[in-house]
């Protein structure tokens, strides 16, 4: 019984915390994202998705150890970039 009461209090506290810390005017945030995406459709050069990091290694080049991330353009390294 005590455990059930503690769980109910914890859920109510977390729900209240979420409501209190929620970002105000979230509709403006979505509207700004829509406007930014619309601008990128009209001007593809403005899109950050089209940019490529030239510091990465092309496929086949030695990258070192097994890791996922930066040295290879694909993001996969198993002694040579995939």
From Swiss-Prot:
UniProt entry tagged with the keyword Disulfide bond: yes
Compartments where located: Secreted
Keywords noted in UniProt: Calcium channel impairing toxin, Disulfide bond, Ion channel impairing toxin, Knottin, Neurotoxin, Presynaptic neurotoxin, Secreted, Signal, Toxin, Voltage-gated calcium channel impairing toxin
Disulfides per UniProt: 56-73, 63-77, 72-81
Record keyword Secreted present: yes
Molecular function via GO: calcium channel regulator activity; ion channel inhibitor activity; toxin activity
Superkingdom of the source species: Eukaryota
Propeptide: 23-52
Parts forming coiled coils: none
Any single Gene Ontology cellular-component annotation: host cell presynaptic membrane
InterPro entries: Conotoxin, Conotoxin_omega-typ_CS
Tissue expression summary: Expressed by the venom duct.
Signal sequence residues: 1-22
Domain comment as written in the entry: The presence of a 'disulfide through disulfide knot' structurally defines this protein as a knottin. The cysteine framework is VI/VII (C-C-CC-C-C).
UniProt record similarity statement: Belongs to the conotoxin O1 superfamily.
Function: Omega-conotoxins act at presynaptic membranes, they bind and block voltage-gated calcium channels (Cav). Acts on high voltage-activated (HVA) calcium currents in molluscan neurons.
Protein name in the entry: Omega-conotoxin PnVIB
Organism per entry: Conus pennaceus (Feathered cone)
């Amino acid at each position: 019984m005590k455990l059930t009461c503690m769980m109910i209090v914890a859920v109510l506290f977390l729900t209240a915390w979420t409501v209190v810390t929620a970002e105000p005017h979230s509709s403006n945030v979505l509207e700004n994202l829509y406007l930014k995406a619309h601008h990128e459709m009209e001007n593809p050069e403005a899109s950050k998705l089209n940019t490529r990091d030239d510091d990465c290694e092309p496929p086949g080049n030695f990258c070192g150890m097994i890791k996922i991330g930066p040295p290879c353009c694909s993001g996969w390294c198993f002694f040579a970039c995939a």
